[in-house]
Each structure stands twice: as C-alpha cells, then as structure tokens.
Design a protein with these regions (language model features):
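A glycine/proline-hinged amphipathic helix-loop "lid/cap" segment
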Residues: 1-76, 309
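Alpha/beta-hydrolase superfamily serine-hydrolase fold, recognizing
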Residues: 62-67, 75-310
Length: 310
C-alpha cells in the first residue's frame, strides 16, 4: 500500500469522523450548520483563481440564483472549445464543492481540452430533491437551447453522480441535447436502499460514509417524492436512454453494492457500459491525488476523448 493512499485514507477518516460517529441529534446540528453555510456564496480557492472564474448566476423559475463556476483552459493548451464538461459535484446533497472537486475538474478539463462548468446547485436541508432537480434541469435546458456546445459531457461524483443520471434521463425525455458521455464516480443512485444488507456489511471498510447517517440525510433530501422516484433514485428510471456510460468506484465503500446494482439494471435495459471497480479503494478515490486516482483520471479523460465527435 503506497504512502499517499495511506495518508489520504487517514485524512478522510479524520475529516469525516464527526459525521460518521455522530448521534442523530448531532447529524441534525450538522444539517443546520450546512443550511447556514449554503446561504453564503462559494469562494474560489486561491490555488484555482487562475483557472476558474465565476460565471453569470443562473436564475431559475424556482427563484434560486445558482452560482456557476467556469474553467478556463490556458492558452497554451490547444484544442477545440466547443465541447463542454458539465460537472455536478458531490457532498451528500448538503455540502458545497471543495478543493478536491476543483482539482479533479481542472485535470479532466486540461486532458480533454473541453470547456467546463460547475453549478452550485441547491442543497438540503434548505431545499429538497424536487426543487434542486427542477433548478438543474432548467439550467441544462438553457445550455441545450443555447446551441453553444457541440457536445455536453456529464461528469459527477457521489450525490452529483446521482444528479447526472437524472439530467441524462430528463434530457432524453424532453428532447434536449443528449449528453455525449456520462461519467460517474462512486454514484449514489438508490435512495430506496435496496442493497441495505450488502451496504452495511462494508461499513467497517468505508473511511468516509456511515450507513445510518446516509439514511437520515437521504430521507431529508428525498422530501415529498417517493424513494423509487427516478429523480430520487435514478437507478429505477429509464437507463436504456443513456449511452456511453462510465462508472468508477471502490471495493471498500458502502456504495459499492449500489454501483453493482446500477450495472445490473443498466444491462437489464439492454445496455453495455464501462464499470470499473478498484480493489481496496474508498469513496470517490478518483478525485484524490493518489496513484489509483491519477490512473482513473487518465482513463476517464481518454474515455471522453475517444467518444467525442468534434
């Protein structure tokens, strides 16, 4: 086991310890903290100020003004600018984007020579799934109707990967521009918790997530929608409409059974995608600066480039 991976996993265990070990009451306190924090605008970390700029806020019919960050590829990188990576960040539906999201998106954008946008969508507990999805769908519709990009490539991690599947399904349903590729990192796709026993069996191996806490957070995010509603659990939606699907996940995360379930359901819909399970890896490992993360990032970039038409 390499030193970088050991350090990263220990760092993650420490960073998420308060939520992993929290009582239900402490989880609710954390949610209220997130509610206050999410009312504040997200700031670009100093390290990324040469690459990311804040785009114009998108005002949805819901009334929400959504921050959007644009990645500007330096002039020294040659390549077409008419392809877009739309990145939906994770964070248990409650947290804003962090440094590792920016680092990963920066790397992917440089490797693929694509423009990149990262919207800061509405979060729980202030907003629920229905409100947030409506906001994101309006934003995607605006991108589609602008005809600015020849291709849109969806990329997301964890909760954001869930939303990527929702957007891809709704784009097909509504006749909007179809995503050229959809890439998911450790997606959370089944809030019905169909694989509950299998998820709990992996609990001791997971350095970030705690099953009981996820159930609480997911129930609040779910709002009034049914657990098997395709906006809540897109694994039960129209998977047959999604082409060029690529999924990366680790064997040591409690969402691994979810991702195997997604693979089975995708194949049941008559589709064939790329599902890469990395042995001994943790949740969203591909985002982190470790050898396995670098290798996964290179493969993801190659996947996008190989399936580009322009």
């Amino acid at each position: 086991m390499n030193a970088g991976r050991v350090f990263t996993e220990k760092y993650l265990r420490l960073m998420f310890k308060s939520l992993r070990d929290a009582t239900p009451e402490e989880v609710m306190e954390e949610l209220e903290h997130c509610r206050r924090e999410n009312r504040r605008p997200v700031r670009i970390p100093r390290y990324f100020r040469g690459f990311f700029v804040e785009d114009e806020k998108f005002r949805a019919s819901t009334g929400f003004e959504m921050q959007v960050f644009r990645h500007e590829v330096p002039e020294l990188v040659e390549g077409p600018k008419h392809n877009l990576i739309l990145y939906l960040h994770g964070g248990a539906f409650i947290y804003p984007p962090v440094f590792f999201h920016g680092r990963f998106l920066h790397d992917i954008a440089l490797r693929t020579h694509c423009d990149a946008l990262m919207p800061v969508y509405p979060k729980s507990p202030e907003y629920d799934c229905e409100y947030s999805v409506k906001t994101l769908l309006e934003y995607y519709q605006s991108l589609s109707e602008s005809k600015r990009y020849d291709e849109i490539h969806l990329v997301g991690d964890s909760a954001g990967a869930c939303l990527c599947l929702v957007v891809a399904q709704e784009a097909h349903k509504n006749g909007w521009q179809k995503p050229a590729t959809t890439t998911l990192l450790s997606p959370c796709v089944d809030l019905n918790h169909t694989k509950e026993k299998e998820m709990q069996a992996l609990q001791d191996k997971d350095s970030m997530l705690q099953y009981d806490r996820i159930v609480i957070l997911n129930a609040i995010w779910q709002g009034k929608l049914a657990a098997m509603h395709p906006w809540v659990s897109p694994v039960f939606g129209d998977l047959g409409c999604i082409d060029n699907l690529c999924v990366y996940y680790g064997s040591d995360e409690i969402l691994q059974p979810d991702d195997l379930f997604l693979k089975a359901m995708y194949e049941k819909a008559g589709k064939s995608g790329i599902f890469q399970e990395y042995e001994g890896m943790f949740h969203t490992f591909a985002m982190f600066p470790i050898p396995e993360g670098f290798r996964a990032t290179k493969k993801i970039a190659a996947f996008i480039k190989e399936r580009r038409l322009h």
